Amino acid sequence: MSNEMKLYTVLSYCLIPIALFFAFLDIIILATSLSNPSALIMVFIVACLVIYTFTSFKFLKTGVEREQIQTKKTKDWIKVNAYVSLFLCSLFFINSISILISTNEVLSGFINEFLEQQAGFPAEITSKMILSILRGVSVFLLVTGIIGIVHIRTTLRLVKRYDYLFE
């Protein structure tokens, strides 16, 4: 097994718990979007990441490793969801970088402005707490974005390389 395939396999296994986490979030977003239909676009985008993760994992296990014939439908599912997931992972990456390179003063200003607009916000939640949560979430999304972008790039290359498996 080449180094590229070893990395791809590791990234695939890393994406599975991330996809399960996002599937759980997607169910919550779906429940809240029933009262706000414009949020359904976010449900669709997050669902694409989950679908991409599991269809690409199926392609890895049955197509690449066992060289079993795959349907054209599987190829279409991988490619369509890969492009939407690439968009989402790029957003994760760009937003995380912008938050992580911002100074604490700038972010604290935005957080304080946000807290002033929230009328019944609990006093126990301070701007420092929100800042640390924001930075932690940004690191998680940065890692997710990098893993996703590298994985999607490799998947699209493998789909092209193993094109003969799709009938």
Residue ranges of model-derived segments:
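Transmembrane alpha-helical insertion/packing segments
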Residues: 1-58
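Cytosolic juxtamembrane helix at the C-terminal end of the final transmembrane segment
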Residues: 2-5, 56-74, 99-107, 142-167
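Juxtamembrane loop-transmembrane helix junctions in multi-pass integral membrane proteins
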Residues: 3-6, 32-36, 66-79, 122-132
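Physicochemical signature of membrane-embedded alpha-helices that form the seven-helix bundle of GPCRs
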Residues: 8-14, 21, 40-47, 77-87, ...
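Hydrophobic alpha-helical membrane-insertion segments
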Residues: 80-104
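Membrane-interfacial helical/loop segments at transmembrane boundaries in membrane proteins
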Residues: 104-126
